[in-house]
Amino acid sequence: MALPITNGTLFMPFVLTFIGIPGFESVQCWIGIPFCATYVIALIGNSLLLIIIKSEPSLHEPMYIFLATLGATDISLSTSIVPKMLDIFWFHLPEIYFDACLFQMWLIHTFQGIESGVLLAMALDRCVAICYPLRRAIVFTRQLVTYIVVGVTLRPAILVIPCLLLIKCHLKLYRTKLIYHTYCERVALVKLATEDVYINKVYGILGAFIVGGLDFIFITLSYIQIFITVFHLPLKEARLKVFNTCIPHIYVFFQFYLLAFFFIFYSQIWILYPIICTYHLVQSLPTGPTIPQPLYLWVKDQTH
């Protein structure tokens, strides 16, 4: 339990309580249905993708290994969010231990960072395949692919840890134990603190730039290089074919980063917002689209 200090201030709440969607408590049981359906679709779709890639030796190539990594990350990310969300909506179990909240936060931001890194790896692989097709087998060796997967996993996992330590060790006083959210998100938790959160905000923005910002820049540069190469192809049919193979990747890329930038804008700058519209857009960031992104990319790759 939390220890009261003065004027309702709490010293390091032992248990936090999720509010869910403020103002919609009476209909949250219905709101949970589409999230549950999306979660089940993501589990089934990504699991099928992993089984197909694992069982088919011809798919043990860099692009499909990255797709498998993206699929496993999608499963892990949605599993770290949706079950607790449904606990709140359906079973009225909004409480979570403070340390468990930090652990969920670490999982969510780590898996989001992995997704960003995998999208960068896929863009670089596509760039080499289109711009330097004869060098692809030399550049993207199995050893390099292994290093990339390990690197994109460790990068966010390590970068998020100082953020958690800053919350745990630096922020001791909280105005309330109520979180106006359905899962543990860094900004939502930091806003509860009554102490100076400048360091936490700076590190949060810095970490987001190191992971998402740099990935976005390099992905954009990769696709610029791809477009330059495509427009120099002599045959119109060849240009259209190569461009069509890039469309699904560009779609997933823009979907992921536009929602991510909207989330950052909402959490850091936009204070007064239409709650239900903003909430659904923000919630779609971790839970993903109706069709799992890796499965969507795989189907599109097979049709071109």
Swiss-Prot record:
Residues 1-32, 83-103, 168-203, 277-279 are extracellular. Its main location: membrane. Pfam families: 7tm_4. It comes from the Eukaryota. Keywords: Cell membrane, Disulfide bond, G-protein coupled receptor, Glycoprotein, Membrane, Olfaction, Receptor, Sensory transduction, Transducer, Transmembrane, Transmembrane helix. Residues 54-61, 125-146, 225-255, 301-304 are cytoplasmic. GO terms for molecular function: G protein-coupled receptor activity; olfactory receptor activity. The chain crosses the membrane at residues 33-53, 62-82, 104-124, 147-167, 204-224, 256-276, 280-300. It is a multi-pass membrane protein. The keyword Methyltransferase does not apply. Glycans are attached at N7. Belongs to the G-protein coupled receptor 1 family. This is Olfactory receptor 52A4. It comes from Homo sapiens.
